[in-house]
Amino acid sequence: MEKLMKRYALTRQGAKDFIICTIVTTIQNIMLMAPVAILYYITSDLISGSISKSNNVAYVIACVIMLVVMGVVFYFQYNTSFFSTYIESEHRRINLAEKLRELPLSFFEKKDLSDLTSTILGDCTVLEHNFSHVMPQFFGSIISTIIIAVSLFFFNCKLAVAALWVLPIALIIVGCSGKVQRGISRKKRKVVLAQEEGFQEYLETVKDLKSYNAEDTYVESLKEKMDNLEKESFRAELGTSVFVISASCILRLGIGTVALVGASLLVKGQIDIMTFFMFILVVSRIYEPMQGTLMNLAAIISQDVNVERMNEITNYPVQSGDGSLDVCLLYT
């Protein structure tokens, strides 16, 4: 719990809510496999010719129950995800403001106003978005994929390997890009701060600039900073997309390998048509949350810079004193 709090700048209650949200998201992802299971049994009855009116009623009831359960799970996941996230965001902003109030003046000498504003508003907003849309979905997808992957080995080991060999490779590609993406995020952050400082300085000194007829020159420097930010943003998006898209392309190879291996085993008589059909359905579904997981992993890696900036403030020693004020008057 302590590591989680320090790693993602969370309160203790926020860390507990995050764990609960991850568990609920895992259940949600597993529930999305329920339509695949019902479709499998319906297709099996159609192929075997054993479908009847009683079976039709049973399938209708199963579909209704599935929809109700999925609706409850989705509702609970939404509440645990967004309500807990915004409550934690409220506590984070208040605690950060209280911490700034207790810091010594030496800290503010090292920081620009735009830097502090960016930390309070920008970094908190990034963490707020990630913990409502990224983090629970990422860890929930990882856990649910592992559970589904283990269950596939009980049906056929060869097809399970053919379906899952791409997952660790795709995760390794994006995971190994962490150092590159953190470097890109830090460079972009410096450019963003330079632009914000430029606009802040312009607003504070606009009268002086006009009086010395230097406004046009300063505006040109601001335009140059904006161009630098545009270029750095392009590099940041390109650096992320290269790794994510490469991993996504490798992820799609799993469908082809399942089709090839499954067709070979089917011709040899080692599996039946329904086992092959089930793996095709599962593979087409299991890669969907993993596709989002790769994007989430890139966002999680890039948020490390935001967490570092917030931890720098929260871990800074506060100004201490006994509350008394000693005044010494000198008379000459």
Describe each PLM feature range.
Residues M1-L32, I47-Y59, Q77-S81, T85, ...:
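Membrane-integrated ABC transporters
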Residues Y59-F74, L167-L171, T240-G254, L260, ...:
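Hydrophobic alpha-helical segments in the permease module
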Residues N79-I87, H91, F154, I172-A194, ...:
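Cytoplasmic juxtamembrane "membrane-exit" helices immediately C-terminal to transmembrane segments
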Residues A9-K16, L105-S106, G122-F131, M135, ...:
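An intracellular "coupling" helix at the cytosolic face of ABC transporter transmembrane type-1 domains
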Residues A214, L238, I286-I313:
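Cytosolic ends of transmembrane helices, especially the final helix of ABC transmembrane type-1 domains
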Residues Q13, D17-Q28, Y40-Y41, I51, ...:
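Transmembrane helices of ABC transporter permease
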Residues T314-L330:
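Primarily ABC-family ATPase nucleotide-binding module
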